[in-house]
């Protein structure tokens, strides 16, 4: 908003190029493992933990993007935030994601299930609070910070679980499926959010997204967590 979309894309492109150069020069070359064949896919999809994790991912991503896709007009029309404050809010949202990644590194190994439960639950809590928080910029910032932190933290934690519970020759494919389903959630959530905006109104996107994410949390607690406890790490 502050510098325009062209400059935004230019900055993102420059940062992405810098990240590629950094990875190419700093990280060591990794030997290629065994090739994954199409015949291994049915076996991968028989893993109950992966299926549960994938299902939770779809619901969480759908709920997230039912709201996030329309956060800018929500802030402008419902929270009555001006352009500079919207930029500040979205920046705080992004920075809170960095906090979520840091918390993952510090806490996940020693507090696995509490970490997953808290970060997963934080997403629908934040979404459901969007409407009530819209009366004040301070509360909007707090809700967006909670939202961004928890969303990033559970996303990274899910990827760690995928790597831990899939063979080395299958982990890349398992991760690709995860990414594909997350993108499915993005598209589905955006469509649902658009229907909410066209119907009840943009003030309701947080409630719609939160309700969907609650389903994801319930699935995680009742299906995914027991599957994780039963599974034996293979990586």
Place the predicted regions along the sequence by residue.
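Structural signature of the two symmetry-related core transmembrane helices
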Residues: 13, 114-129, 210
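Extracytoplasmic gate region of multi-pass secondary transporters
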Residues: 49-91, 95-98, 112
């Amino acid at each position: 908003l502050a510098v325009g979309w062209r400059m935004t894309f230019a900055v993102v492109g420059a940062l992405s190029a810098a990240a590629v150069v950094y990875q190419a020069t700093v990280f060591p070359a990794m030997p290629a493992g065994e090739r994954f064949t199409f015949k291994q896919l049915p076996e991968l999809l028989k893993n109950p933990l992966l299926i549960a994790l994938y299902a939770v991912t779809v619901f969480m991503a759908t709920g997230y993007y039912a709201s996030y896709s329309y956060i800018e007009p929500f802030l402008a029309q419902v929270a009555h935030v001006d352009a500079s404050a919207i930029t500040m809010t979205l920046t705080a949202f992004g920075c809170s994601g960095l906090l979520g990644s840091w918390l993952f590194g510090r806490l996940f190994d020693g507090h696995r299930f509490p970490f997953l439960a808290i970060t997963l639950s934080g997403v629908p809590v934040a979404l459901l609070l969007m409407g009530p928080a819209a009366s004040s910029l301070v509360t909007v910032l707090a809700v967006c910070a909670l939202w961004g932190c928890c969303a990033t933290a559970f996303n990274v934690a899910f990827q760690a679980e995928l790597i831990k519970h899939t063979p080395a020759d299958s982990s890349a494919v398992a991760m690709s499926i995860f990414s594909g389903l997350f993108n499915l959630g993005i598209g589905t959530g955006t469509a649902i959010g658009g229907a909410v905006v066209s119907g009840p109104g943009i003030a309701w996107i947080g409630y719609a997204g939160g309700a969907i994410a609650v389903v994801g949390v319930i699935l995680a607690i009742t299906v995914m967590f027991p599957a994780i406890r039963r599974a034996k790490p293979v990586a």
